[in-house]
């Protein structure tokens, strides 16, 4: 499960403009990194150009999956992840990032912006945060916590069963104790009454 | 906001725009004129006419203004003209803002009306999902910006409120309040339209499921009938299948795919939510089991308690018995000692006196 890039684009009429992007290319060898980055930028632009407004789509490219979300106001986001990464989390991330972006960056700057001029720095944080979808996505987080709770509860059940066995032992032992004490009392009384 | 606005009004021009805009644009104007009844003198310029294309009655504002001016000059002479001019300029600025907001409001109302018409359409094949989505988005943005503008207007009124007269202030407050109430009613309408839309979507899905499941259930039936039963029945079932397939024209299936693509994300969200829900239900049942088991163990614990208590009683009773016995034994020993003493004494006497 890995995210490779997260980019925000503006879907212009003929071409898509890259507004801001964040990359995580640490898994590639040092010499490939720049070309990989370039390739990812190109792919993102191409995908945004080919997908319609207000649509979500997932495109498979070799073993990578590109999740794209174009809002109806032409702002688009692309996430490139490996095929294991859950698409729902990717779309949640896109929605969140685009919302944030549209709040922080003025609408007028969208068609003319470039990575150098746009002042929005949240992408890298989001990218590193969403590397682990279990932590970042609230729904998966809740799910994971619930699973944990379930395991804990199962453990509790087991210990409760053990406790039940021990209690049964205690019951039998206390019964033996009761009969023995009764016998003790009887012999003591016999001792007393005989002479 | 500005480009959106243009686009929206252009879009709605041919539709319901005229019918609604008349009433909507009029309403701020009527609010202005009604509230200005109490303040005719200091706010002559507040009665700037609404755009002529939307006015249905005759525009007599100019006459009224001139009458006002003549009245004013007759009453106060020249000395009051300067502050009045200043106030008038402020006032006109305020009126301009108010009018702009009113216009925007009416535009948004028109869009909302269009959305309502689109959303209330029940047909399965003529569903303009994209348009509706876009309109919804636009209206949402419009409402937001209107909210912002009204807040600005309020700030403006507050800033200028201290300088201008009481009447002017109440007048502007009335305008702001009326604009706000318009906006509130519009957002209510918007909400109800959205509700209608979701309801429609639900119904459509139900119908689609009915039609798309039908052929699947008819398929296994057909071969059976062809094999043994009368041929007419088989043909009949096939005919019904044909009918069912006809419903799934390429157009429909294409639409289905499109909608499915759009829905996949929502579907996956719903699935996850369902997962979470089922896990929570499971957890609940586990907790119940736990409670049940703990309750069961309470009985065994009570039994242990009783046993231990009984043993304690028995042991205490035995202890007291043994104590008693011990006491009796010790008292017996003294007796024996006494007897022995007496015997020894007698023995000594016997030995001394008889030997």
Swiss-Prot record, chain B:
The transmembrane residues are 334-354
Query: What GO terms in the biological process aspect are recorded for it?
Result: early endosome to Golgi transport; Golgi disassembly; intracellular protein transport; positive regulation of protein catabolic process; regulation of Golgi organization; vesicle-mediated transport
Source superkingdom: Eukaryota
Segments on the Cytoplasmic face: 1-333
What Pfam family is a match for this entry?
Answer: Syntaxin-5_N
Please tell me which stretches of this chain the record labels as motif IxM motif. Answer: 245-247
Q: Please give the GO cellular component terms listed in this UniProt entry.
A: cytosol; endoplasmic reticulum-Golgi intermediate compartment membrane; Golgi membrane; vesicle
> Does this entry carry the keyword Transport?
yes
Q: Which residues lie on this side of the membrane: Vesicular?
A: 355
Q: Which keywords does the record carry?
A: Coiled coil, Golgi apparatus, Membrane, Transmembrane, Transmembrane helix, Transport
Task: Name the membrane topology term.
Answer: Single-pass type IV membrane protein
Q: Which family does it belong to?
A: Belongs to the syntaxin family.
Instruction: State whether it acts alone or in a complex, and with which partners, per the record.
Output: Part of a ternary complex containing STX5A, NSFL1C and VCP. Part of a unique SNARE complex composed of the Golgi SNAREs GOSR1, GOSR2, YKT6 and VTI1A. Component of a SNARE complex consisting of STX5, YKT6, GOSR1 and BET1L. Interacts with BET1L. Interacts with BET1. Interacts with COG4. Interacts with GM130/GOLGA2. Interacts (via IxM motif) with SEC24C and SEC24D; mediates STX5 packaging into COPII-coated vesicles. Interacts with VLDLR; this interaction mediates VLDLR translocation from the endoplasmic reticulum to the plasma membrane.
Q: What does this protein do?
A: Mediates endoplasmic reticulum to Golgi transport. Together with p115/USO1 and GM130/GOLGA2, involved in vesicle tethering and fusion at the cis-Golgi membrane to maintain the stacked and inter-connected structure of the Golgi apparatus.
According to UniProt, the name of this protein is: Syntaxin-5
Question: What species was this sequence derived from?
Answer: Mus musculus
């Amino acid at each position: 499960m890995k995210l490779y890039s997260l980019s925000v684009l503006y879907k212009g009429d003929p071409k898509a403009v890259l507004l801001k992007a964040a990359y995580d290319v640490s898994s590639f060898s040092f010499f490939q990194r720049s070309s990989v980055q370039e390739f990812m930028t190109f792919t993102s632009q191409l995908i945004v150009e080919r997908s319609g407004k207000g649509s979500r789509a997932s495109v498979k490219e070799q073993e990578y999956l590109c999740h794209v979300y174009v809002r109806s106001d032409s702002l688009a986001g692309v996430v490139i992840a490996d095929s294991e990464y859950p698409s729902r989390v990717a779309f949640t991330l896109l929605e969140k990032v685009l919302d944030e972006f549209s709040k922080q960056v003025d609408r007028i700057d969208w068609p003319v912006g470039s990575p150098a001029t746009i002042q929005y720095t949240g992408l890298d944080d989001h990218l590193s945060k969403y590397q682990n979808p279990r932590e970042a996505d609230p729904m998966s987080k809740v799910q994971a916590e619930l699973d944990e709770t379930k395991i804990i509860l199962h453990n509790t059940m087991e210990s409760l069963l053990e406790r039940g066995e021990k209690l049964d032992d205690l019951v039998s032992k206390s019964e033996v104790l009761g009969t023995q004490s009764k016998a003790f009392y009887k012999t003591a009384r016999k001792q007393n009454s005989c002479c | 906001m500005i480009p959106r606005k243009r686009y929206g009004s252009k879009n709605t021009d041919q539709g319901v725009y005229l019918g609604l805009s008349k009433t909507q644009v009029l309403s701020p104007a009527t609010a202005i004129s009604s509230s200005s009844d109490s303040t005719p003198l200091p706010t002559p310029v507040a009665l700037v006419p609404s755009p002529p294309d939307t006015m249905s009655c005759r525009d007599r504002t100019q006459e009224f203004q001139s009458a006002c001016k003549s009245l004013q000059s007759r009453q106060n002479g020249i000395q009051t003209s300067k502050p009045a001019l200043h106030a008038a300029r402020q006032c006109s600025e305020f009126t301009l803002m108010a009018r702009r907001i009113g216009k925007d409001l009416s535009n948004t109302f028109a869009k909302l009306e269009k959305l309502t018409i689109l959303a209330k359409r029940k047909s399965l094949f003529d569903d303009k999902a994209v348009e509706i989505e876009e309109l919804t988005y636009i209206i949402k943005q419009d409402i937001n910006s209107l909210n912002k503008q009204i807040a600005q207007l309020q700030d403006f009124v507050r800033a200028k409120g201290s300088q201008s007269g009481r009447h002017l202030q109440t007048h502007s407050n009335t305008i702001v309040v009326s604009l706000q109430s318009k906006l509130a009613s519009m957002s209510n309408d918007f909400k109800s339209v959205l509700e209608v839309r979701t309801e429609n979507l639900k119904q459509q899905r139900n119908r689609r499921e009915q039609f798309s499941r039908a052929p699947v259930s008819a398929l296994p039936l057909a071969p059976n009938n062809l094999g043994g039963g009368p041929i007419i029945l088989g043909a009949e079932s096939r005919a019904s299948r044909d009918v069912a397939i006809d419903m799934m024209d390429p157009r429909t299936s294409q639409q289905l795919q499109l909608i499915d693509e759009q829905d996949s994300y929502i579907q996956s969200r719903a699935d996850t939510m369902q997962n979470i829900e089922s896990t929570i239900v499971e957890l609940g049942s586990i907790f119940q089991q736990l409670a049940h088991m703990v309750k069961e163990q309470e009985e065994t614990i009570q039994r242990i308690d009783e046993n231990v208590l009984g043993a304690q009683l028995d042991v205490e009773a035995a202890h007291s018995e043994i104590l008693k016995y011990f006491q009796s034994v010790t008292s017996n020993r003294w007796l024996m000692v006494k007897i022995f003493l007496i015997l020894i004494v007698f023995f000594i006497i016997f030995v001394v006196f008889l030997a």
